């Protein structure tokens, strides 16, 4: 459009250039003829004078044309550029609108399955809020609905080994219900809860065996008690053995992902792009390294739990309940140590083993004693701690208190904890 406009102006300018010349020649001819008809003796000389005047006028017109034409052409070019700049954002915006619609696959996944994700609160029945008079929240986690009649799947560490507490579940629509623990398997860190509600949105279960490294996944849950939180990433590994993570008595190949899984995400679903749960969010080591229990392993737990319920007994396996300290921990394997040292300059270079404290329950003995997430336990009661089994053994001792040596950054510190009896 701008080019057509510039072409029209060019034609007009050519006509303007030609018309002054024609006009001056016609004027000269008319003046010469008038002089001859009147019989002026100096008519020949006057006609030459008129011709000179015409030539001067012609030169003047040419000067004006030469002066105005560049400005006019510059205006045309500027108008074309401005018009093109005006059109460019419109075209880009239309393309971006289509791109947003075509590539917003994470939002499509969330829209299809977020209603089945729940927020789980563990209420301390011994301590009450000063203003509301309600039990305070000792810890929290996530879960997701697997049956319309109120059966919820979560991690065992979210709901058990917490004396003097009660469990509450908040749905995505804000409704809150008390929950009862039905099935527990501490070995696999899985548990089911029941709330007395029907016609709930159910999460579809996929197949973790078909996953590939690099596949997109979405983690749903309530990190740091922030309900309905969505993070996304890819599957980093489909076969991360529990032995690599220093987890005792667990024959599980975990799913490793770089999707952010923070405190409170535990028990929530790890979902594929078809909106199917392919894992249960379990733990985080550091930013970009988190783990989930494969859904194929979870299905075995659910089948056994259903058989037990048909027989009238709950499905409970795992270790005997020991004294309660209130932490979630992870053994520092060589691979994990290497990753931590590469991400943090505060890690001592001579550290070769220990246990990482990655969660501390508020109000627990560990919290009261001063343990913090990120601390590394190296000794308990003067015994070297190499893995999480050593911590369990220390809890099984008859010692009333635990004198714990920790590394916090580059500083070595001592804390004293008095575990609670079961």
Swiss-Prot record:
Residues 325-410 form the PDZ domain. SMART domains: PDZ (SM00228). It holds the Pfam family PDZ_6. InterPro entries: PDZ, PDZ_6, PDZ_sf, Peptidase_S1_PA, Peptidase_S1C. Residues 1-17 form a transit peptide. Changing residue 92 to D: Reduction in levels of cleavage. Ubiquitinated by th, thereby antagonizing induced cell death. Its EC number is 3.4.21.108. A motif (IAP-binding) lies at residues 75-78, 94-97. It comes from the Eukaryota. Residues 29-55 are annotated as: Disordered. The chain crosses the membrane at residues 64-82. Interacts with th/DIAP1 (via BIR 2 domain). Interacts with Pink1 and rho-7. PANTHER family: SERINE PROTEASE FAMILY S1C HTRA-RELATED, SERINE PROTEASE HTRA2, MITOCHONDRIAL. Belongs to the peptidase S1C family. This is Serine protease HTRA2, mitochondrial. It comes from Drosophila melanogaster.
